[in-house]
C-alpha cells in the first residue's frame, strides 16, 4: 500500500471518529425548555416531562414562569413594566425543582440559553382568537429580541374544561366541553399561522383524545386543572413527542401508581394528537 493510500485511510478514519464523537455530543447536549404561562403550564411541564426525556437518554433543563391564571395581556403588561411578578420554577438536569420568587421575564429569558420557549393564553380566553390577536404579537416581539436566533417559539394548545366544571370562564363556551375544545383548537391554529409559530403543542387535543377512552371525562382534578397523574402525564407525553420527535408510545417511564392501561391511553392520546393536532382521535383501549 503506497503512502498516499495510507494517508487517505487515516484521514477517512479520523473523519469517521469525529462524526461519531459529534453524534455522542449531540445526544448528550442538554435541551433547555421554558414555558411562559400559568397553572396550565405547571400541569404540563413541572412533572414527568423531565423523566420521559431522561428515560430516552435526553438531558433537559425545564423552566416555568408561573402566575396563576396569567393571560397573554398580563404577560405583555409585565414585559412592558419589567415586573418581577413571577415564580420561576426550574427543573435542572438532576430532576430537582427549585423556585425563585419575584422574577421578571427579562431576567428569566437571560437565565439560560433556551432552545424552546412556549407561550399560551389563560384558559377562559384560550378559545377566543381576538385575545391572541390583541396581545400575542407584542409578547412574541419582546421575547424574540431577548433570545438567541436558534430558539424555537411554541404555542401551547391547552385543554377544555371537564363537562361538569364550575369555572366561571366555561360560560364563554356555553358550558360545553366540545364547543370549548373546538374553539381552542381553531384559535390556536389561527394564532400560530398569523404569528408564524411552527410548533404547536396540542395538549388540549391529547386530553380530548384520552377522554374518548375508558377513562372518560376524568382527566381533571377540579374541573379545569389536570389530574395529577393521568392528566399531567398525558400533557407531558404530548410535550415530549412534539419537542423531541420521538414516538412516546413505548416510553418506559410512567409515574408511580399509574397502571399499564392508563399509561397506554396517555401515550397513545399524545401520539395521536401530535399527528392530528386539531381533531379528536377515538381511542379503543380497554382497562
Where are these regions (language model features)?
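Residues that mark the start of a beta-strand
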Residues: 30-32, 61
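Bacterial N-terminal signal peptides that target proteins for export
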Residues: 2-11
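Sec/Tat signal peptide C-region and signal peptidase I cleavage site
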Residues: 22-26
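Bacterial N-terminal signal peptides
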Residues: 11-21
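Conserved catalytic region of serine esterases and O-acyltransferases that act on ester linkages
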Residues: 29, 219, 223-287
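Alpha-helical cap/lid subdomain in secreted, periplasmic
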Residues: 101-228, 241
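Conserved SGNH/GDSL esterase-like catalytic core that processes O-acyl groups on lipids
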Residues: 43-132
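Extracytoplasmic/secreted envelope proteins and their assembly/folding machinery
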Residues: 46-50, 133-140, 185, 236, ...
Amino acid at each position: 500500500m503506497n503512502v498516499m493510500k495510507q494517508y487517505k485511510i487515516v484521514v477517512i478514519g479520523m473523519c469517521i471518529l469525529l462524526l461519531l464523537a459529534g453524534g455522542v455530543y449531540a445526544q448528550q447536549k442538554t435541551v433547555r425548555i421554558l414555558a411562559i404561562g400559568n397553572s396550565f403550564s405547571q400541569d404540563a411541564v413541572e412533572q414527568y416531562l423531565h423523566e420521559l426525556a431522561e428515560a430516552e437518554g435526553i438531558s433537559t433543563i425545564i423552566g416555568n414562569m408561573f402566575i396563576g391564571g396569567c393571560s397573554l395581556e398580563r404577560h405583555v403588561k409585565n414585559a412592558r413594566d419589567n415586573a418581577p411578578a413571577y415564580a420561576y420554577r426550574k427543573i435542572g438536569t438532576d430532576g430537582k425543582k427549585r423556585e425563585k420568587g419575584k422574577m421578571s421575564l427579562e431576567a428569566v429569558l437571560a437565565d439560560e440559553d433556551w432552545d424552546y420557549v412556549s407561550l399560551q393564553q389563560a384558559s377562559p380566553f384560550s378559545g377566543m382568537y381576538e385575545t391572541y390577536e390583541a396581545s400575542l404579537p407584542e409578547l412574541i416581539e419582546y421575547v424574540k429580541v431577548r433570545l438567541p436566533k436558534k430558539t424555537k417559539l411554541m404555542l401551547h394548545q391547552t385543554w377544555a374544561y371537564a363537562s361538569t366544571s364550575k369555572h366561571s370562564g366555561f360560560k364563554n363556551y356555553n358550558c360545553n366541553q366540545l364547543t370549548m375544545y373546538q374553539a381552542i383548537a381553531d384559535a390556536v391554529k389561527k394564532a400560530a399561522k398569523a404569528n408564524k409559530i411552527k410548533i404547536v403543542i396540542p395538549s388540549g387535543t391529547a386530553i380530548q383524545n384520552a377522554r374518548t377512552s375508558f377513562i372518560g371525562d376524568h382527566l381533571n382534578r377540579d374541573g379545569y386543572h389536570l389530574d395529577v397523574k393521568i392528566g399531567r402525564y398525558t400533557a407531558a407525553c404530548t410535550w415530549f413527542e412534539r419537542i423531541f420527535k420521538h414516538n412516546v408510545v413505548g416510553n418506559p417511564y410512567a409515574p408511580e401508581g399509574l397502571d399499564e392501561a392508563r399509561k397506554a391511553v396517555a401515550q397513545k392520546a399524545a401520539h395521536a394528537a401530535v399527528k392530528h393536532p386539531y381533531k379528536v382521535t377515538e381511542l379503543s383501549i380497554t382497562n
